[in-house]
Regions:
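Class I S-adenosyl-L-methionine-dependent methyltransferase catalytic core
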Residues: 1-219
Length: 219
């Protein structure tokens, strides 16, 4: 549920129903409070369906006709959500502690089930970064597209600001906090892939940003 940002975006959109999940019991409690707040603000015109579990444990047979599915799966060893916290054993990185197990029992099956849950014109967007483990890069993006190639519609780069680090990371030669180094670090931006899939081969959500075709470029 993206720490609640996707839930918030839902209430700011024209969508009428939201489905989400999070295995962390503490953030889940916060989501419930957020829903109470937004429902009061919007007059209770929207409905939500949230589950305190991982995506692999959702009742997928009950989830159908989804118009838009967006997910950013935990990047295996890179994002260890709720580490040391209550019910950490429900997190995908804990349950599947080898890349191949994580891929085969969580990442790819959940992606397939998400695609299956779409309506005939629905879209699925997956933001995933190839994790690097002990110097080896695992091609999560390629593996996803290879599995769902018949429904692959395109890819876009998502611009992301640098994630903050603690002051202890930035020290000068004397061991003191180096604000200039921290400021320089925070100026950095990077690009992450968002892969786009749909059952509808004629759907093109990127058409509004296209200026020309490659064929026309060479004519």
């Amino acid at each position: 549920m993206g720490w609640g940002d996707r839930l918030t975006a839902f209430y700011a959109s024209n969508a009428t129903h939201y489905i989400g999940c999070d295995p962390n019991p503490n953030t889940f409690k916060r989501y419930k409070k957020m829903i109470e707040f937004w429902d009061k603000l919007t007059g209770g015109k929207k409905t939500t369906q949230i589950y305190n579990c991982g995506a692999e444990d959702l009742p997928w047979d009950e989830i159908k006709n989804v118009d838009c599915a967006f997910t950013s799966p935990p990047y295996f060893s890179t994002e260890r959500y709720n580490e040391g916290g209550e019910k950490e054993e429900l997190q995908s990185w804990f349950k599947f502690n080898e890349y191949e197990s994580w891929r085969d029992n969580f990442y790819l099956p959940v992606s397939q089930k998400t695609l299956d849950s779409l309506s005939e014109t629905g879209i699925m967007m997956i933001n995933i970064l190839d994790p690097k483990i002990k110097g080896k890069r695992y091609r999560s993006g390629d593996e996803l597209v290879d599995m769902l190639k018949d429904n692959f519609m395109g890819q876009v780069g998502m611009r992301i600001m640098q994630r903050p680090q603690g002051k202890s990371v930035f020290k000068d030669a004397d061991g003191n906090f180096d604000k200039a180094a921290m400021d320089e670090f925070m100026k950095r931006i990077y690009i992450e892939n968002v892969w786009y899939f749909s059952k509808d081969k004629n759907k093109d959500i990127f058409r509004h940003i296209k200026r020309n075709t490659l064929e026309n470029f060479f004519t």
